[in-house]
Amino acid sequence: MSFRAARLSMRNRRNDTLDSTRTLYSSASRSTDLSYSESDLVNFIQANFKKRECVFFTKDSKATENVCKCGYAQSQHMEGTQINQSEKWNYKKHTKEFPTDAFGDIQFETLGKKGKYIRLSCDTDAEILYELLTQHWHLKTPNLVISVTGGAKNFALKPRMRKIFSRLIYIAQSKGAWILTGGTHYGLMKYIGEVVRDNTISRSSEENIVAIGIAAWGMVSNRDTLIRNCDAEGYFLAQYLMDDFTRDPLYILDNNHTHLLLVDNGCHGHPTVEAKLRNQLEKYISERTIQDSNYGGKIPIVCFAQGGGKETLKAINTSIKNKIPCVVVEGSGQIADVIASLVEVEDALTSSAVKEKLVRFLPRTVSRLPEEETESWIKWLKEILECSHLLTVIKMEEAGDEIVSNAISYALYKAFSTSEQDKDNWNGQLKLLLEWNQLDLANDEIFTNDRRWESADLQEVMFTALIKDRPKFVRLFLENGLNLRKFLTHDVLTELFSNHFSTLVYRNLQIAKNSYNDALLTFVWKLVANFRRGFRKEDRNGRDEMDIELHDVSPITRHPLQALFIWAILQNKKELSKVIWEQTRGCTLAALGASKLLKTLAKVKNDINAAGESEELANEYETRAVELFTECYSSDEDLAEQLLVYSCEAWGGSNCLELAVEATDQHFIAQPGVQNFLSKQWYGEISRDTKNWKIILCLFIIPLVGCGFVSFRKKPVDKHKKLLWYYVAFFTSPFVVFSWNVVFYIAFLLLFAYVLLMDFHSVPHPPELVLYSLVFVLFCDEVRQWYVNGVNYFTDLWNVMDTLGLFYFIAGIVFRLHSSNKSSLYSGRVIFCLDYIIFTLRLIHIFTVSRNLGPKIIMLQRMLIDVFFFLFLFAVWMVAFGVARQGILRQNEQRWRWIFRSVIYEPYLAMFGQVPSDVDGTTYDFAHCTFTGNESKPLCVELDEHNLPRFPEWITIPLVCIYMLSTNILLVNLLVAMFGYTVGTVQENNDQVWKFQRYFLVQEYCSRLNIPFPFIVFAYFYMVVKKCFKCCCKEKNMESSVCCFKNEDNETLAWEGVMKENYLVKINTKANDTSEEMRHRFRQLDTKLNDLKGLLKEIANKIK
């Protein structure tokens, strides 16, 4: 089957699944979207399903009362029943079929649970029964059927057996399987029902289990309550009482089964009547052909046997004859242990050997059996063991989480691979093992040296492995010849992103794109939206707009591996994404891109656990990027540095450094290789061995540059222009430009201070005019940065400070120009003074490059955030105290200025130790207040009839004490603790934080024009003129993308691929060494434990 056909087939199956409605009762919910009305369903059942009634009374000679051999008394027979005295009773001759009178919903009165039930003849056609289950009771077509048998009587559930049953139910739930049991509240069936109930309670209703019980109608206790009333119309609800205290030999029905099929052959008290119909139903299901089955177009069915006696033996025998594989639990006792022990016999199987095993495991049962029946048992066992390839044995003592799953999958695989029509169907066998995630079997049985696999043969199963998140199978297919690049066509990627991509992830991606306005996020969102082109979204105005499509699909067609990697990363497919990452080109860039995407998405996820998983995976990819780059750098520094600046359109045109910074991957930026690269950029052509003081000295004594005082990384090519080359290389170095800017900025601040303090006149003097020209140069530089960075310019706090400083300076000039007005001139000077503070604080940013001062500056920045939190808490305390104090002391103060002083200013000063003096009546000074409110004094406190302060001191003084205690001790110490935590956090990663912040300064000066201040202004004029000339001539830049097409890029990526393989080998070797070390430690512990046991025995013997 071609991949396109497989994909269309998967799409059809998905649509069929959406169109069908699953109806479950008891632990399953009933569907409300029925294709038939209740009356149609009743008509269908009455037309196709029958009950059986005995119409010939044959007296049972062994019975004491007048009872027929069918088990019913003569009075319980219908009117007109004939008397039969000579013939042997047979249900086919002596019973007659009538329309069934027992079907509908069954409600268990004890627990109030519901289920579906029907009474049907033992001769009912299996096809009609299957139609009832799937089309009328709306059960989804099973992906697997598990027929559980054994342990109907005297069954005691062991803890390990309960674990096996729990795993069996989990498999049924996860695989969409049907479980077939005896359906009674007795023995094995009772415990199966309880496990079904426990698993149903712990999971959502959409994942409920289908547990079908098939029991004999004549063995059901209280079955009269299941018969419909004569006047009942439509569907019937039967009220069934579970009477556990009844000593009746009959069984009660189990309340945890979802569907009950009650098989009737006209008898009462005759067990095993249902066996024939159950076998027919199992055979019909196993032979039914369905589309898209991973079992050769059939529904897989497996018999699960434990314990049991004769009926279990017959059930296993029938299953084996019908080519149904069987899983037997060794250690569960009785017939299961007999079969398990005989499977291990290597010699030819003799009757005596079989009988020996029967006597060993079933001594009482075999001793009571007639010889003929014993021979029948031996015959059945031999028939079973002739098809030993259909038997799979698991040991109850070794019951683990995967033992049941492995056993069922292995049983199905053996049955499938040994069948005549499917033994050469390698693709079908591989699908089966993929469905059950059996990698070892696939490795050992299918991918052998006997067969050569083509890439096209593995494409269908590869797609299944991707959507089922089977990373080990994906790796296996890649190792066996699958070409991932050829497999990832546009149709495949469209199918993955449109039908196997979480809508929630898509919404989170869209939220992140809108929130952070990030280039990579926008690119990835457009890429995903291009595949999900049928998706529509509604904008804020309520209008519909189509998804944005990528106009250039080349990033997708040229980089399908990166698109698949992004698909896996966005959905947090941890192990699968790692397998795909190993196949991509530009692994370092891909790892950093994954880290950035995951960290950004984690910020917008509402689920804390999901956000934590994304953060954890992001950190893993950062670690991979660090380790891989370290491997590359240790091999070749120059090529490793080329990797840092390599960009790819599949990641929005970003390079490794940009993605690492945007993802805040400080560990990567702090790597020696990255820092050495930044240092090369920082010093330019100047050798890094040159001392900084030499470079700074050359700024003041320029001729030293050409005298060999400063060393350079390389020698000039043209000897005649050697001196010119030295000067150009020196003054274009970012470090020299930075140093010159520092000198210039300090000179600018000194000039600014001189003008403010000594030379500020009504008419500007030359120093002030020089100051204006220097600020103009700063203004031009900020305009250039804004033009280059766009909106991102204002994301940097220092840029905001620069803009604010320039804005204040312009405002100061505006006031300064009105020199005729003294007040305006003074206002201008005040604004200049405030602006000087901003420009001076801006000096802090320059020294972030210092290894010693840089971390301290970062601490200051983070402590400012702590101060804002502190001020919020302090404001609550301050306003509460200030309003209460003012209201207690004074009445109807109308002056806002004094209200502000009393409510805000004075409580604020109290935090610094200035205790309010107006809360103590004994020391209150009326000379410093006013009663009229007209003077520049605070309002006096309210007086009583004796002209004494009215306020109660027993309130005001304790109030001040509590306020001082809360602010000066509690809040201030809280702030100190916050500062301590912040400093400690930065101190722990002192080196990383500084190196990360250093990157921004290096990039800032590397992106600037390499011309010292203030001469750079001429370059700005030249750039403006050039831009205007281009606009007038309407020149267009038609350069096309050359991503990954340059020879140097291909060589670098090929070399990185080799380094990646070395890195992966080291990881695997390290993991193997760790495992070996653990095994060695366990062996040492085992030896020590044995020595201790021996020592304890010696001590015990001495005591005796």
Swiss-Prot record:
Cytoplasmic-side segments: 1-733, 790-796, 849-853, 984-1104
Glycosylation sites: 934
UniProt feature: intramembrane region: 896-912
Catalytic activity: Ca(2+)(in) = Ca(2+)(out); Na(+)(in) = Na(+)(out); K(+)(in) = K(+)(out)
Consequence recorded when altering residue 1008 to Q: Decreases in sensitivity to PI(4,5)P2. Reduced the sensitivity of the channel to menthol stimulation. Insensitive to icilin
Predominant subcellular localization, coarse grouping: membrane
Resulting phenotype, residue 802 to A: Decreases ion channel sensitivity to cold stimulis
Residue segments, region Epitope: 187-195
GO MF entries: calcium channel activity; identical protein binding; ligand-gated calcium channel activity; metal ion binding
Sites where the protein binds Ca(2+): 782, 785, 799, 802
Compartment(s) of residence: Cell membrane; Membrane raft; Endoplasmic reticulum membrane
Biological role: Non-selective ion channel permeable to monovalent and divalent cations, including Na(+), K(+), and Ca(2+), with higher permeability for Ca(2+). Activated by multiple factors, such as temperature, voltage, pressure, and changes in osmolality. Activated by cool temperatures (<23-28 degrees Celsius) and by chemical ligands evoking a sensation of coolness, such as menthol and icilin therefore plays a central role in the detection of environmental cold temperatures.
Free-text comment on this protein's domains from its UniProt entry: The coiled coil region is required for multimerization.
Similarity comment: Belongs to the transient receptor (TC 1.A.4) family. LTrpC subfamily. TRPM8 sub-subfamily.
Protein name: Transient receptor potential cation channel subfamily M member 8
